[in-house]
Amino acid sequence: MSKKKFIVPALLAGSAAVAAYMFAKNNDTGEEVPDDCYVFDNGKHCAVYRERGPVNVTMIGGRHTGKTDLVCDNILSANKSCVVFDKNGEKYRNLKETLKNSGFAVGRINLMKEHASVYNPMSFLEDDMDVITFVRYLMDIQLDGETDFLRKAEEMFLSACVHYLMQYKEDADIHMLYDMIPAVENEGDYLVDDDALTKTTQLFSVLDETSSAKRYYKAFLQAAGLMINETLVKCKERLNMLLPLDGDYEDESGIVDLRDKKEAIFVTFPADEYYTPAHEFYVKSFMTHLFKTLTNVNAEKLQDSDPVCIFVDDYEYVKNTDMFVGTASILRKYRVSLFATLSNVLLNDADDVISLLSCSNACVYLGGCRDSYAEHFLAKYFDTDCLIDAIKIKYVD
């Protein structure tokens, strides 16, 4: 195999602290470890090449294989802004004070129902394209591949609602998208007559003809034709999806520009059965805002700056929010480094895993996956020349 540089699971180049920790804990060879190296369980150490730019790493292993510890070690050794997807808020509670003492501004986008500081994606919509993107995310999450012949009409109505919020929320008791539900329902539980249509018409009829909300509402009427009520029923279902995240929706994210200062943003969300489509919707909205923020940075500043790091522990909980792991080109464009861990590699998740691995400079398998398919899948995906004892690394030119 030709000589190639390779990347190891250390997104944050220059973190001698993690190297020393891993060396003291796991290395029995007695070798001297260079400052820019990281040591793993078998005593092997690999160089980190600082000039390579963003580093995207995937770590795969079962329970109790040390994935979370490695994530936390890398977060604490950060020397640049980072975003941490934080299941149940554990990392926020454990790391926030240490990060503050290290000079970070620590923020939190909290999607946990029992807390109040919930992220409001409406705060960052600025133009028609933002609105359309926002609405399509909301619809796609619920469609789950099914064909919806009312899709165009739904898209126009939901866009009208969003534009209404953007333009008139200062003068109304409407701050979040689901606050529009009263505009599409009557006194009963379901839309069974024209009362709701009358109420909706009253809401938009008083608006100026030049307003975007009025323009999209007219487009909705044209697209829906004789199926206006049926369209409103579907729209109400989509708005109802957001109800589980009830709370105080004052924007407390504190995000201005992750490249202007060292900032650590924790996106906390519930795991297991408490993780709903609404959480996915808010996470996708946040990632849209994050990438838009990075896009707005001028090219010269973007080139000279360190990449923002994204940490995702237990990727399977956020795998459907794959807009930030879809292709390596997206990550390179925005100079975003990704550190993800995955606890299970299952047959029915193969496409999701390949999507994640395809944008990774390196993958490390820590063992411990109970499903025998995991071993077969990894052995088939990685070149056998990339095997270093129990650790499989994907090399890149």
Q: Where are each of the predicted segments found?
A:
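Conserved H-loop
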Residues: 340-347
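Conserved P-loop NTPase catalytic core
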Residues: 352-386
